[in-house]
């Protein structure tokens, strides 16, 4: 443990001395030391043209999620609880699910139903409905218009339970889910893009628990391609054109294994691999 602390301290000191960009400020503190924060998201939720912050708290233990409002100068002196209940939340992405011009919130919860909160346009969020199953271990949400109807849909990543696609009914409601993949896929994150250039969005799943990562191809999401090793224990995935060849590549971040970039080719394959970072960490 001492070695890890020293490494982190040296790394932080080096970054600070070289750039001197990041400084702590009392008004920049979000939440308390007791908060079990899983993730944050940022967007202008109250329409005043600055970025506000949504904090997802709890993980496995129910806590209150929070909205922190920007004062226009990058400080967050005012906050509000999201909803009346504490939840076991992992992620709260924001998007305009009903196309009324403001950002709504989608809450991903562990071992309880996920939630939709709709914005009244002024940053007040009213609970609208639940979606998903009560026993699902939701870890992440991918928000994207899969069926090209102009409304965002929700792809739900559930750890060791069925993953689902929830299509928007054009009114911001998500009722019946479409299952895809294995029933016990241990998915943590999902990213989406048209990887094989056929006009349909595909889904890349970051899996843990000794499971391979997978690519599921649209529009039906039955056909899949295995990506990486079952020893990767992947925690995150991103998609971008890393080598500027006009073809999308896939980046995975792993625990106990090297992080990887999988370079795509014109046939939609990802055979060329470049690893980055080292495991185990060097001892200083």
Question: In which residue ranges do the predicted regions lie?
Answer:
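Blade-edge motifs of beta-propeller repeat domains
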Residues: 17-35, 69-87, 118-136, 167-185, ...
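Beta-propeller blade termini
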Residues: 38-47, 90-99, 118, 139-148, ...
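A generic tandem-repeat structural signature
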Residues: 87-95, 101-112
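Hydrophobic beta-strand segments that make up the repeating blades of beta-propeller
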Residues: 53-58, 105-109, 154-158, 203-207, ...
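Short glycine/acidic-enriched loop and turn motifs that connect beta-strands
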Residues: 58-62, 112-113, 161-162, 209-211, ...
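Sec-dependent N-terminal signal peptides
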Residues: 4-13
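Beta-strand-rich domains and repeat architectures in extracellular enzymes and scaffolds
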Residues: 30-43, 47, 53-55
């Amino acid at each position: 443990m001492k070695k890890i602390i020293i490494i982190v301290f040296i790394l932080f000191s080096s970054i600070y001395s070289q750039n001197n960009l990041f400084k702590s400020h009392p008004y920049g503190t979000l939440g308390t030391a007791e908060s079990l924060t899983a993730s944050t998201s940022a967007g202008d939720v109250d329409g005043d043209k600055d970025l506000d912050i949504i904090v997802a708290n709890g993980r496995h233990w129910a806590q209150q999620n929070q909205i922190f409002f920007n004062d226009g100068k990058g400080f967050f002196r005012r906050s509000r609880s999201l909803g009346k209940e504490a939840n076991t939340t992992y992620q709260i992405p924001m998007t305009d699910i009903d196309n009324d011009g403001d950002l709504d919130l989608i809450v991903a919860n562990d071992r309880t139903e996920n939630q939709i909160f709709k914005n009244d346009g002024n940053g007040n969020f009213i609970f609208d409905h639940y979606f998903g199953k009560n026993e699902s271990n939701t870890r992440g949400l991918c928000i994207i218009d899969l069926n090209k109807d102009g409304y965002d849909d929700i792809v739900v990543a559930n750890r060791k339970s069925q993953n689902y696609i929830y299509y928007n009914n054009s009114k911001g409601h998500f009722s019946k889910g479409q299952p895809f993949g294995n029933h016990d896929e241990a998915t943590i994150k999902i990213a989406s893009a048209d990887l094989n250039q056929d006009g349909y969005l595909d889904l890349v799943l970051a899996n843990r628990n000794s499971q391979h990562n997978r690519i599921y191809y649209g529009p039906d999401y039955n056909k899949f391609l295995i990506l990486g090793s079952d020893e990767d224990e992947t925690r995150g995935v991103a998609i971008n054109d890393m080598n500027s060849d006009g073809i999308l590549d896939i980046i995975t971040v792993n625990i106990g294994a090297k992080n990887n970039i999988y370079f795509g080719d014109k046939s939609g394959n990802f055979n060329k691999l470049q690893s980055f970072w080292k495991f185990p960490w060097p001892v200083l």
